Regions:
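Walker A/P-loop
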Residues: 236-250
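Short, locally clustered residues in the helix-turn-helix/winged-helix DNA-binding domain
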Residues: 232
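PLD/PLD-like phosphodiesterase catalytic module centered on the HKD motif
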Residues: 1-221, 225, 229
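Secondary-structure transition/hinge residues
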Residues: 176, 235-236
């Protein structure tokens, strides 16, 4: 039995369409970055995302819209960091499992340079727009966390748009490594939950309580997502039996 999609819950509590170029999070749901991103994904011919980390909670929110975008032929590129191990393996497994190889998913690969960008770029038939600010992909950062983000287009500010977009292309093409199955397995094997993740998880839990009146049902999370993805891959390879060994409580 699966928990109701967190994006659907938010859509239920806020049905009024509201467009803004400045998003600040907080208690006013009109200031949530999530609503503007979801609307942009629905219309875009291609999507480029660059964030310093991905968390399972945020990926779950965007999966539905990204999947719909792929089904209508949109191209999606995502560049994220493995800096300090904040990116959760379960978030990467979700993307690979739900969206497949259609998404070009990569790690920034310069070990001696910090990586803290947060930007979302959407390309349409006649123009492109770019969100830039402080939000990585986590539930709290997309909703009620105090995060400041601003949106502009290549029509309103073409010079600075080109600076940001060209830098993204350079980083993506020349300073990254593809997150294929082997790279993901290696990252997951070496990953240790950083101390800061406890705070980020607490923020997401608090936001979940504030924005949802739904009674949560059981859904896979964390290492459970990794195990289920591995089982599905095993079935796809033709195996008829498998054994999962895990510690109690995983």
């Amino acid at each position: 039995m699966a928990e109701r999609n967190t994006a659907e819950e938010l859509d239920d509590v806020y049905e009024i369409k509201y467009s803004t170029d400045a998003m600040t999070g907080g208690a006013d749901k009109r200031m949530y970055l999530y609503y503007q991103l979801a609307d942009s994904i629905k219309k875009a011919d291609s999507v480029d995302i660059i964030v310093s980390f991905l968390m399972e909670s945020g990926v779950k929110m965007l999966l539905g819209e990204l999947d719909n975008a792929l089904k209508r032929g949109a191209k999606i590129r995502i560049l994220t960091g493995n800096y300090l191990g904040i990116t959760q393996p379960s978030a990467l497994y979700l993307i690979k499992h739900k969206l497949g190889e259609q998404v070009d998913l990569r790690f920034y690969n310069e070990k001696n340079r910090s990586f803290h960008p947060k930007s979302y770029m959407f390309h349409y038939k006649d123009y492109s727009e770019l969100y830039i600010g402080s939000s990585n992909i986590s539930r709290s950062a997309l909703t009620s966390g105090i995060e400041w983000n601003y949106r502009f287009s290549n029509k309103t500010d073409p010079i600075n748009y080109e600076k940001f977009y060209n830098t993204f292309v350079d980083l993506f093409e020349n300073h990254s490594i593809v997150i294929d199955d082997e790279e993901l397995k290696k990252y997951s094997k070496n990953w240790h939950r950083p101390a800061v993740s406890k705070d980020l998880d607490r923020y997401d839990l608090q936001d979940d309580k504030e924005t949802s009146n739904q009674i949560p049902l059981f859904e896979p999370r964390g290492a459970q997502i990794e195990a289920l993805c591995a089982l599905e891959n095993t079935r796809a390879e033709g195996a008829r039996r498998a054994l999962v060994q895990a510690a109690t409580g995983v």
